[in-house]
Amino acid sequence: MAFLKLRDQPSLVQAIFNGDPDEVRALIFKKEDVNFQDNEKRTPLHAAAYLGDAEIIELLILSGARVNAKDSKWLTPLHRAVASCSEEAVQVLLKHSADVNARDKNWQTPLHIAAANKAVKCAEALVPLLSNVNVSDRAGRTALHHAAFSGHGEMVKLLLSRGANINAFDKKDRRAIHWAAYMGHIEVVKLLVSHGAEVTCKDKKSYTPLHAAASSGMISVVKYLLDLGVDMNEPNAYGNTPLHVACYNGQDVVVNELIDCGAIVNQKNEKGFTPLHFAAASTHGALCLELLVGNGADVNMKSKDGKTPLHMTALHGRFSRSQTIIQSGAVIDCEDKNGNTPLHIAARYGHELLINTLITSGADTAKRGIHGMFPLHLAALSGFSDCCRKLLSSGFDIDTPDDFGRTCLHAAAAGGNLECLNLLLNTGADFNKKDKFGRSPLHYAAANCNYQCLFALVGSGASVNDLDERGCTPLHYAATSDTDGKCLEYLLRNDANPGIRDKQGYNAVHYSAAYGHRLCLQLIASETPLDVLMETSGTDMLSDSDNRATISPLHLAAYHGHHQALEVLVQSLLDLDVRNSSGRTPLDLAAFKGHVECVDVLINQGASILVKDYILKRTPIHAAATNGHSECLRLLIGNAEPQNAVDIQDGNGQTPLMLSVLNGHTDCVYSLLNKGANVDAKDKWGRTALHRGAVTGHEECVDALLQHGAKCLLRDSRGRTPIHLSAACGHIGVLGALLQSAASMDANPATADNHGYTALHWACYNGHETCVELLLEQEVFQKTEGNAFSPLHCAVINDNEGAAEMLIDTLGASIVNATDSKGRTPLHAAAFTDHVECLQLLLSHNAQVNSVDSTGKTPLMMAAENGQTNTVEMLVSSASAELTLQDNSKNTALHLACSKGHETSALLILEKITDRNLINATNAALQTPLHVAARNGLTMVVQELLGKGASVLAVDENGYTPALACAPNKDVADCLALILATMMPVSSSSPLSSLTFNAINRYTNTSKTVSFEALPIMRNEPSSYCSFNNIGGEQEYLYTDVDELNDSDSETY
């Protein structure tokens, strides 16, 4: 809030603050602006209301002052008057229709302000004008909340008497009693309780009023609530009881009261902490701790992470409390889950007095903690020299390593405190001792850029060229982390060898380049020329073989965008076109990552622009175009020779323009087009940049291509134009632009691809309704052209009902009975795939339900053969499909359902059959449905057939009855026939005898060799549907692989 000087305000405002109505009247008469606003939008009326001057308020309003004017905080004059507890001012404002429901930016009404400021008389004037006294502010608090928080008993009584909801809660679910308890307003708490407030209510975090009172130390409220019998051990959402909360906040009087009333002193919260843990840690918890310990609190109780109260004192440096806990029987060397004792914790946080106390009490200074470290490790790592000194005085082997082989000197070197390091060195620490990774303290000092420690270690005789397990020297680590070069320079001056390579073949130059440390590179170059370092493998490496890395420092600097480091490198390294294992140059990597400065540096130094990598045969121009780095692209093209570099092709024939369009980089597309890129260049699949834009749907890129004359009807190797691809992918914006372009060239966009499919086929097949609608608006697509597997076939086979309906509405109902090259209608397609909605649509437009294809199959047969039960049910029930029809192999729909084991479909058909002749109808192999169902083990179908009079004695072309047809092969069938003949001897004239002997007559004629033919199996004609999900030959599967733009067509039928 800005404080303004009164003398700088208008005369009218000054007169108001002087309380002079006559002067105000005179100024108003002189046409002073009564609605003037200061820089916080406060008007003179706000000032009068703030002062509570009713006469001046009246005068201003009558002179045209806006009674509901809002300042920058949305406060009205009524808010101001109420805040000043001026009843007269409020009455005047209300008389002139001041808005009692006006809200400020905190959504507080004048009633909220009155409740907070104990303006009872003002509230009495406001309440009768309000429809609801329970309106809440932005925090969800009602006027009752504010009154309770402020401790205004009279206001609370008034609000309750006028219908205030005593249990209303704010956005944290806190009620008025929570706030009154927290603030210690005992009379208000009693008043609320007497009016039915819940004393055990909980907020969102399950804090009760007792928690609230305990946290703020309001003992009178605590006692009152305890007298009412509330549960003193009730946990909140974190498991903290009121005793926990009181200890955490250091409210010793409340703690004493709770303990006296029987609170559980060892109650654990969700993390396993007891009140004693909180008392040990909190700022003002000393007296609380004394009370807890004196009342039986367990000093060795552990939290879930294994910490005892003694750990907590060590963590927060509570020296006197640690003594109390130790005297009460605490275990000195108890471990937490990381294995750390209180001594470890105290050492880690540098609490010297606590360390003294713990050691005096017998703490083991040689006890291992996390990762096997001693307390001395932690003190040295954190740089607490006084703590180190105390721990050293206890006496133990200073070079004892932790679990990773690191000594205390390693820790001190990593921590960077010179005093700790010197203390350890003077005590005799071994500065050449290595950890399990082969690193000495000098490695750690270099890695952390601790110059003073590094200086001390080298001065003590530490080897500067020692290798760790990765083959790295301290110089490698300094090159990685040293931004100002001090550590690296000192190592170089002390004979560190910059040519030594690690096991990956990297030396200090590589590391400096990778992290962009220009100063380090300059320092190394001043010692040894960089090109010399790159040619040598190091010096005294154990292996004689050259272990140089395939990645050069130039690659590393370029890839990470360190152009300043790159500037140093290009001055010394002559081969700027050095390649990595995949054949990429530093310029390629810089262009790929979009590092313009690096690209500029390399080009200016003569790096080759048109060099191709080994794998994709791409140049840096391709790399920049792929990732949309337009600035890099302009630099590369502008400096490339010859000029046709803009259309350079990669291994797949792709130009930079194609890659830019493919990835939707409009800026790059325009840059390339402006440089003369061939807009119709083709790759090895015959696809142009426009084909790619059609597939990816990048409209801006497509527009740019069309503006530069791209041909929209160029065909790829499969005969597909960009119009085909945009329709197949559903990119309506791109399709519209292409159709418009075709129209402007007076070209026919309805051309078919190599398999006869038009864009309409593709759009229908993939269900892109908006594209279908757009294409059908073109007169040329309203003609039946292309593959006989029509767009309607394509739509229904993939259940694209919307597209199918558009086709029928636009092209007429006659298309529902169109046939493909194998005589199949759209109804066949819908039946094959069980798309009921499409089936219903076709039937509603008089599709011929009994039409047959070239194999004699009806849609019902197609559905029955493929087990499409929903379609079968619809066709036999709603569409009354003919059940007596037979295909070219004399199979009925019932035969086909049974032959494929589709029991449900067979039962649905059987349900509609009443003709016994149809039940016993035979196919070309003389098999009845009973033969086929029995052979396939369809028990329920067999039972139904028998119930409908199916003949059990009918014989097929092999002389087998349905019973014998159950045999898995002919040999078993003939054996079964022999057994049946022996079991049931009957006269030769009986039907059973003749049937049996027909089956076994080959056994009774000894002059012939027994030879059984295989039982004919129900099989489809070669032209049957194999997979109606594809369109092959004339019905090629409509499919586009957007990513590869190189799809394959599989035969369907």
From Swiss-Prot:
- Does Cytoplasm appear among the keywords? yes
Q: Name one GO cellular component term.
A: cytosol
InterPro entries noted in UniProt: Ankyrin_rpt, Ankyrin_rpt-contain_sf
Q: For this UniProt entry, what is the primary localization, expressed as one broad class?
A: nucleus
Post-translational modification, briefly? Answer: Ubiquitinated by the ECS(RAB40C) complex leading to its degradation and decreased PP6 activity.
- Please report the residue spans annotated as repeat (ANK): 40-69, 73-102, 106-135, 139-168, 172-201, 205-234, 238-267, 271-301, 305-334, 338-367, 371-400, 404-433, 437-466, 470-500, 504-534, 549-578, 582-611, 616-645, 652-681, 685-714, 718-747, 755-784, 787-817, 822-851, 855-885, 889-918, 925-954
List residues traversing the bilayer: none
One Pfam family assigned to this protein is Ank_2
* Subcellular localization(s) per the UniProt record: Nucleus, Nucleoplasm; Cytoplasm, Cytosol; Cell projection, Lamellipodium
Q: Which residues carry this modification: Phosphoserine?
A: 1007, 1011
Q: Which UniProt keywords apply?
A: ANK repeat, Cell projection, Cytoplasm, Nucleus, Phosphoprotein, Repeat, Ubl conjugation
Q: What's this protein's function?
A: Regulatory subunit of protein phosphatase 6 (PP6) that may be involved in the recognition of phosphoprotein substrates. Involved in the PP6-mediated dephosphorylation of NFKBIE opposing its degradation in response to TNF-alpha. Selectively inhibits the phosphatase activity of PPP1C. Targets PPP1C to modulate HNRPK phosphorylation. Involved in the PP6-mediated dephosphorylation of MOB1 and induced focal adhesion assembly during cell migration.
Q: How does it assemble?
A: Protein phosphatase 6 (PP6) holoenzyme is proposed to be a heterotrimeric complex formed by the catalytic subunit, a SAPS domain-containing subunit (PP6R) and an ankyrin repeat-domain containing regulatory subunit (ARS). Interacts with PPP6C, PPP6R1 and PPP6R3. Interacts with PPP1C and HNRPK.
Q: What is this protein called?
A: Serine/threonine-protein phosphatase 6 regulatory ankyrin repeat subunit A
Q: Which organism is it from?
A: Homo sapiens (Human)
